[in-house]
C-alpha cells in the first residue's frame, strides 16, 4: 500500500508539471548536397541532416549538422543564488572525445543537461553548429543528440525492437548499421536468435557492457 501511494504521488506530480515552452524556430531536416555543393532539403533518408532556418530574405537556409559545440562564458545554477558553473568556456569539435573528470557534484552531468536544454543557463551562450541552442526547437535539438547514462534501461522485446526505440521509423538495415557503429553487431550475432532474440527483465540476459552497447546503438 505504501509503495502504491508513493507511486501515485509521483504520477500526480508528473501530471502537474507544466509543459515545456518550445521557443526555437530552427528545425532538423533530412538533407543532401546539391549539384552546386550547397546543402538542400530532401524527403529521402540520406543519413545526412541539416538545420533549417528562415533567413532575413524570407527564404529557408540550411546548415549541415556536424556536432560543433561551444560554451561561451556560461553561468548556471539550479538555484540562482548558488551558481554551480561559472564563466565556462568550452569548444567541442565534431568527432572529438572529451572526458570531464571531477568529484561528485562538480557539474559533469550538468554540462550535458545544459546542451539538451533540460535546464537553461543564467548567463552566456551555448552554440550548436553556430546556432544558439535557444533558437533550436527542443524536439529537433534533443533528437540530434544521444545520451547514454551509466544505468541503461532495456524493454521487453527483441534486440531489434530495443534498438529501434531510438527512431521508430528506422528500417532493419538502419538498426543493424547503428549496431555496427556501436560495436554491438558482433555479440548480437552470437545471441541465440540474433537480432530477434527476446530481452526480458530490463535485459538481464545480457551483461552490463552489452546493455550499454545496445543503448549506444539506440
What do these predicted regions represent?
Residues 1-16:
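Cytosolic ends of transmembrane helices, especially the final helix of ABC transmembrane type-1 domains
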Residues 16, 31-218:
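ABC-type nucleotide-binding domain
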Residues 21-32:
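Solvent-exposed, non-transmembrane helices and loops of integral membrane proteins
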Amino acid at each position: 500500500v505504501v509503495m502504491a501511494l508513493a507511486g501515485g504521488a509521483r504520477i500526480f506530480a508528473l501530471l502537474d508539471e507544466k509543459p515545456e515552452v518550445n521557443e526555437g524556430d530552427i528545425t532538423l531536416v533530412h538533407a543532401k548536397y546539391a549539384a552546386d555543393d550547397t546543402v538542400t532539403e530532401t524527403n529521402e533518408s540520406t543519413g545526412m541532416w541539416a538545420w533549417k532556418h528562415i533567413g532575413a530574405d524570407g527564404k529557408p537556409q540550411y546548415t549541415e549538422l556536424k556536432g560543433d559545440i561551444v560554451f561561451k562564458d556560461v553561468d548556471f545554477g539550479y538555484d540562482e543564488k548558488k551558481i554551480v558553473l561559472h564563466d565556462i568556456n568550452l569548444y567541442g569539435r565534431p568527432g572529438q572525445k572529451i572526458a570531464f573528470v571531477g568529484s561528485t557534484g562538480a557539474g559533469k552531468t550538468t554540462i550535458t543537461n545544459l546542451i539538451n536544454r533540460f535546464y537553461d543557463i543564467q548567463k552566456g551562450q551555448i552554440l550548436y553548429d553556430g546556432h544558439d541552442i535557444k533558437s533550436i526547437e527542443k524536439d529537433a535539438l534533443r533528437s540530434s543528440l544521444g545520451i547514454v547514462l551509466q544505468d541503461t534501461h532495456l524493454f521487453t522485446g527483441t534486440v531489434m525492437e530495443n534498438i529501434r526505440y531510438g527512431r521508430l521509423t528506422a528500417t532493419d538495415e538502419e538498426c543493424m548499421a547503428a549496431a555496427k557503429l556501436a560495436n554491438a553487431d558482433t555479440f548480437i550475432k552470437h545471441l541465440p536468435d540474433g537480432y530477434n532474440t527476446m530481452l526480458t527483465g530490463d535485459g538481464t540476459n545480457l551483461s552490463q557492457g552489452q546493455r550499454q552497447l545496445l543503448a549506444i546503438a539506440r
